[in-house]
Amino acid sequence: KMVCVDPNDIPAVAIVDPELMYSMPKGLTAATGMDALTHAIESYITPGAWVMSDMFELKAIEMIAQNLKAAVDNGKDVAAREAMSQAQYIAGMGFSNVGLGIVHSMAHPLGAFYDTPHGVANALLLPYVMEYNAESPAAPKYIHIAKAMGVDTTGMSEAEGVKAAVEAVKALSASINIPQKLH
């Protein structure tokens, strides 16, 4: 996948209408939801992250964790679809200012070479990259990811926060039937 960017490609207005998502198949809903989660998590732990991008990304993570499964299970769930449309937009507001990370760097060629949907490739790679990045200065942020995903982080150490965040991502991915392996 080649990315081309030009200021003339940036729209003046973006219309995000959850009603247009009602007919999306479950697999597409799951994959695009995990793509949005990957956007939020990658840009939250990227070295360029700062207080404003963190605010957007934590809210997006929370909204996705609370609504993605419902949107996958029932495509006509108005509240879940609306929350997911807002969450993906909020995640985009954050990552457009700080960038993404190695998950997307690897997901693009994975999708191209193995015909893997982009969101599925992201979902497969995200937990492993999170574990790898846990050795970085971003490690203290993982406990906030876990908390945003609904984990009770009271009294957790940094290492426990990392594990909880990774496990929460894996659990959400599995709950919406994202393949857990490439084959």
Q: What kind of feature is each model-predicted range?
A:
Residues 31, 78, 100, 120, ...:
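Non-catalytic, surface-exposed connector residues within folded enzymatic/regulatory domains
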Residues 40, 106, 129:
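Active-site pre-Tyr helix/loop in NAD(P)-dependent dehydrogenases
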Residues 2-98:
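Carboxylate- and glycine-rich phosphate/diphosphate-binding segment that chelates Mg2+/Mn2+
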Residues 89-122:
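Glycine-rich phosphate/pyrophosphate-binding beta-alpha loops
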Residues 113-183:
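Gly/Pro-rich interdomain helix-loop hinge
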Residues 44-50, 98-100, 132-139, 180:
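Short helix-capping/linker segments at secondary-structure and domain boundaries
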